[in-house]
Amino acid sequence: SPESQFTHTPGLKVVYASTPYNAKGLLIAAIECNDPVIVLEPKRCYRGPFYGDPHNVPTWKDHPEAQVPESHYTVEIGKARLALEGNECTVIAWGAMVHVAQAAIRESGISCDLIDLQSLVPWDMEAIEASIEKTGRCVLVHEAPKTRRFGSEMAASIQERCFWSLEAPVNRVTGWDTPFPHTTEWDYMPSPARIAEAIHKTMEE
């Protein structure tokens, strides 16, 4: 996955947009940054917030995060966004998976913090630690394969930094460890049902 290739390169900063608002803010922040910054944009979010149903893709019209000021603004590199607030489980996602995770949280009925990472390198470990101290549980969601990915490093860091706060192991919902199959794309991608199942599993551990 491109995110793994770039995040494993020392010296690069990597940001990942999930909405029109943070896409503009992160891009301007990247332009103004003195360091090299890779800006990743999920094509799945070009038309609207993708909630995991390929037959029902809404547009950005009337979505609060689609209101993009014409004036200059930036989204700080290295700072996460709290997309949903809860108290039972922390769900961490980035890019298009933020919206799929939102749908999954609604489906699960579990009160969850949803952290939109926004910045992969550096990532906002303080926001993650604060959330896990509150919830005691964590689910990571990304569309890249599971093995040897950026999410693996993040899960390891969370286990190290939040060990005494965690009441269950960090759970991950990812793409499969296969070449990306365009003809069966929707079977490959993490779905709301898979994420909701992982949230329930984490709550039971």
Task: List the predicted regions and their residue ranges.
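Helix-enriched interaction subdomains in cytosolic or periplasmic regions
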Residues: 11-14, 21-67
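Conserved thiamine diphosphate
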Residues: 1-33, 175, 198, 203
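Thiamine diphosphate
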Residues: 43-44, 48-205
